[in-house]
Regions:
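Secretory targeting and sorting signals
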Residues: 1-2, 6, 10-40
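N-terminal catalytic or cofactor-binding beta/alpha core of small enzyme domains
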Residues: 38-288, 295-326
Length: 327
């Protein structure tokens, strides 16, 4: 009997310890839950990315462009900082981009384009107390896929509605970058703010960083109707080789109903873009570049502008697929 009793007691001992183990486990779970709740209460839920109507944003943005002589030429360090930040974003290092951009007086945030699920990085000049108008522009980078093309707007306001054309083009074709100058081309002393013809601008620093990564550019401009009579659009490669992308762009625009002047075999009224700094940079890097001049009549018509953006967006999609080469 004594042996049996001891044996029964030996069997019961693990059973006595099991409730203690369960209680300890429950205590750990409760503690972990409390810690999680406290952390969430302190930091709040992840903030949803703000939605931005790109066209409305740009319309408001250009209203606050610098006045005459307020444009400031960025120094070499500032241009390098912006270039580094944009390169970080394009290379998928969004978190790393904040430091160099902030050093140049820029902010970066993620926004969602209205009417879509596309998330983009918005790079903008810092505002608030002490901020001075500089006119260096904004950049939008598609975060949904690898960057493969860019829309460039060097003369917003001066070439009226090219800023809206660039915005619609960027919105229609994924995988792009929108590079928007931040001042009227006459806002600086001399041609200081004419970023299409200056090496020392943030605009050029960004476009050069993209060209260094072999990202093609579509740059939109505007001309007075009487500068190239009878033409809606003038297409060229600037000083670069006229490759398949440039020729295909001309065909696409013609198919969309526009009268297209092909600068490589027609007299288009000196609108070829041969002195364009971004075009020269792309040519030096053997990167496809499309220089598109648009008549005032086309730019002033919302319908025509949308048809133009749709045709250029198809060219951008082909660029993204690697369908064209520089030569």
């Amino acid at each position: 009997m004594t042996l049996i009793t001891h044996a029964k007691r030996a069997v019961r001992k693990p059973g006595h310890r099991r409730p203690l183990a369960v209680a300890a486990l429950l205590a750990l779970c409760v503690t972990a839950t409390l810690i999680t709740l406290v952390f969430r209460a302190a930091h709040g839920p992840p903030a949803a990315a703000p939605t931005i109507d790109l066209e409305e944003h740009i319309r408001e943005y250009i209203r606050h462009f610098p006045s005459d002589h307020e444009y400031r030429i960025p120094d070499a360090a500032q241009r390098a900082q912006v270039s580094e930040g944009i390169a970080d974003i394009v290379d998928g290092r969004l978190d790393a981009a904040g430091r160099p951009l902030s050093e140049a007086g820029y902010t970066v945030r993620t926004v969602r384009l209205a009417g879509s699920h596309r998330m983009v990085a918005q790079v903008a000049e810092a505002t608030g107390r002490g901020a001075q108008p500089r006119g260096w522009g904004e950049v939008f980078v598609d975060l949904g896929r690898r960057v493969q093309w860019s829309a460039q707007v060097p003369h917003p306001v001066s070439d009226q509605h090219t800023e809206l054309l660039g915005a619609e083009l960027f919105s229609r074709a994924p995988g792009g970058v929108l590079v928007l100058a931040g001042a009227n081309r006459d806002a600086g002393r001399g041609n200081a703010a004419d970023v299409a013809h200056r090496q020392d601008s943030v605009f050029q620093a960004v476009c050069a960083a993209l060209a260094a990564r072999r990202i093609p550019g579509i740059q939109v401009h505007g001309f007075a109707d009487d500068s190239s009579p009878g033409n809606d659009v003038v297409v060229s490669a600037g000083p670069g080789e006229v490759g398949p992308g440039v020729r295909e762009a001309a065909r696409s625009l013609s198919s969309a109903g526009f009268t297209v002047c092909r600068a490589w075999d027609q007299d288009c009224g000196r609108l070829e873009g041969t002195t364009n700094v971004q075009a020269r940079t792309a040519a030096a890097d053997d990167v496809p570049f499309l220089h598109v001049e648009n008549s005032r009549s086309v730019r002033d018509s919302r319908t025509a502008r949308s048809r133009l953006a749709a045709a250029l967006a198809e060219v951008a999609r082909q660029l993204a697929k690697g369908g064209f080469t520089a030569a």
